[in-house]
Amino acid sequence: MSRPTHVTSGPYAPPAPARELTAVSADGARLHVEVHGPADATVPTVVLAHGWTCSTAFWAAQIRDLAADHRVIAYDQRGHGRSPASDACGTDALADDLEAVLAATLRPGEKAVLVGHSMGGMTLMAAATRPRFREHAVAALLCSTGSSRLVAEARVLPLPAGRLRTGITKRVLGSRAPLGPITPVARAILKYATMGPGSSPGMVEACARIVHACPRAVRHAWSQVLDLLDLDHGVRELTVPTAVVAGTADRLTPLAHARALVATLPNCVGLTELTGLGHMTPVEAPDVVTGRIRELVADYAQIKEGA
């Protein structure tokens, strides 16, 4: 049976890109990249980095809106979507891959607003000191992410914080078991773990298609990276104006992570707390997330490009 990929109709169906290309990372890993929107060099550019077990399809709502008047670049993290898997998994690889995408898609000195969800946000933290990041990033948006203690603070299991919950959570998130077909039970589990209780069936279906399409070996390999994650130093190096978005019902990266980011970021320009929403904020609140991106572009990218 073929693996489900993404929904093909409705607001969460991925739009066709204007151009596709392959970026080659430092270790030779090949990354699938999509470019959406006008080719006009005067329009602002936004770069989207998705999270663990997701793909470019996760950004469908943002791409559809922003591509009307922005150049939008989205790429599949290694092993996800149409980017082949690699033996190298780690925060250095995430940073290398983002640098490769920036080099392949942006002109020298071109500025862009960089947006990361979950592991995509961690990618921005990991790359904060890299030369290409500093050359191109004019502002950043971190959605539903954290910099350390991810497993210890996750609330996927209804248990009190402590060694027991941490140990079981580690085994659950790091499981090598296949997710299987998308059934009503599978949808209910995914909704409970990753989305707010008010998420619509269409939102849940879109996320289920994307997550279930991630190969289990890739899911397991990157879960080990997230388990050991420590990017607190990267947050302190993220000096561009940075906004944070988080759901108050996020079980994977609870609100405490967002508040810690706000307290640590050198140049935080706001925290948006979305009441009752879970981990999949770009899908659960597409208008809010897209609106924050547009605000960052208006406040920073257009000023820089016109200077």
Language model segments and positions:
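Active-site loop/oxyanion-hole signature of alpha/beta-hydrolase fold enzymes
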Residues: A29, R64, I73, Q77-M119, ...
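Conserved HGGG/HGGXW glycine-rich cap/lid loop of the alpha/beta-hydrolase fold
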Residues: A29-A85, A104
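Active-site glycine-rich loops that stabilize anionic/oxyanionic intermediates
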Residues: G51-C54, S118-M119, G146
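Flexible "cap/lid" loop of the alpha/beta hydrolase fold
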Residues: T129-L173
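Conserved alpha/beta-hydrolase catalytic His-Asp/Glu region
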Residues: S148, S175-R236
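Short beta-strand/loop motif that positions the catalytic acidic residue
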Residues: L238, V244-A246, D250
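Conserved alpha/beta-hydrolase "acid-adjacent" motif
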Residues: R251-H257
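Catalytic histidine-centered segment of alpha/beta-hydrolase-like enzymes
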Residues: L252, L271-G291
